[in-house]
Amino acid sequence: MSKNTSIGFIYNRQFPETKDKAVETITRLGLKSGTWWVSSAETLHTKSEELKNTSIAVVFGGDGTILRTIRVTSSFEVPLVGIKMGKIGFMAELTTDEIESRLPDYIFKDKRIRVEKRMMLKAEIISPDSVSNNSNASLQSLMQSS
């Protein structure tokens, strides 16, 4: 692994099975204590110290969990690999059946795995008096509603 040596395991706290699968994965991969950390996507914003030293984040859930994770991890430039456990999984790279056979390639930087950098958009809503009311980052698209 690179100078960043920690692996983050992120789950959706609304679905306890995602945390169970994250913990099971840590055990099955035989990761040493101190080389990994676990967080829900909902509390990930409290993990800035851990994210500074993270080489990869493994996200258990659907596209919503992945998008919540990206909002926090993007400023740390942490690559993600998604494990599909939600209803929608277009953004997830792996299924739960592929964890043991393929996830080590991502974690231990197999040369066949390439990181795809994605552009993000930032939208800011400014009121008529030029005050910024809201700012949001987006990976996929922006939508205006009246």
Positions of PLM-derived features:
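Generic beta-sheet signal
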Residues: V81-I83
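Proline-centered loop/turn at the N-terminus of a beta-strand
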Residues: E77-P79
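N-terminal glycine-/serine-/threonine-rich phosphate-binding loop
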Residues: M1-G61, T65-S75
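Catalytic core of DAGKc-family lipid kinases
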Residues: F90-S146
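Short, acidic/turn-prone active-site loops that include or flank metal/cofactor-
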Residues: M85-I88
